[in-house]
Design a protein with these regions (language model features):
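Post-transcriptional modification and biogenesis factors for structured RNAs
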Residues: 1-153
Length: 153
């Protein structure tokens, strides 16, 4: 929701493509655009993964929840649960906030659940592209474990 830095957006797209997601959705306004830098940093991810700009992120999240049964999980410092406590095996949208500011209020209100990534050191949060990778690959891990029959949501 409003990632401004093109290097961060490119890294998010790279992780998303590697995790097998269907699309990356960004706000049409107040967000980095797909530029030559984004394409380069994504290491090919931007060439294989649709990056869709929407005019109203909150409305988009509401629509995919209602029309397609997508669970919307947002990352936030103040959260309902930690990442590893959340079932991420079904249809899922992971929402990450802008650098420094986090998610906008209406975007936050359209999340089914807010999650945080547990931090063991002295820093209190990760860079948005690192947070994206951690969340995406936790979902991949859960789905693989479910396929193997060793994970029960």
């Amino acid at each position: 929701d409003g990632v401004q830095d093109t290097h961060n957006l490119g890294a998010c797209i790279r992780s998303a493509e590697g995790a097998g997601v269907q699309a990356v959705v960004v706000p049409r306004h107040k967000s980095a655009r797909v530029t030559e830098t984004v394409v380069r940093v994504s290491c090919g991810g931007a060439e294989h993964l649709p990056v869709v700009a929407v005019g109203n992120m909150a409305r988009f999240l509401s629509k995919i929840r209602e029309d397609y049964g997508v669970k919307v999980v947002g990352t936030a410092d103040q959260s309902d649960a930690e990442l590893y406590e959340v079932n991420m095996t079904g249809p899922l949208a992971i929402v990450l906030g802008a650098e420094g500011e986090g998610m906008r209020r209406l975007t936050r209100e359209n999340c089914d659940q807010l999650i945080s990534i547990p931090m063991a050191g002295h820093v209190d949060c990760l860079n948005v592209s690192n947070a994206a990778a951690v969340c995406l690959f936790e979902s991949v891990r859960q789905r693989l474990m479910l396929e193997l029959g060793v994970f029960e949501p």
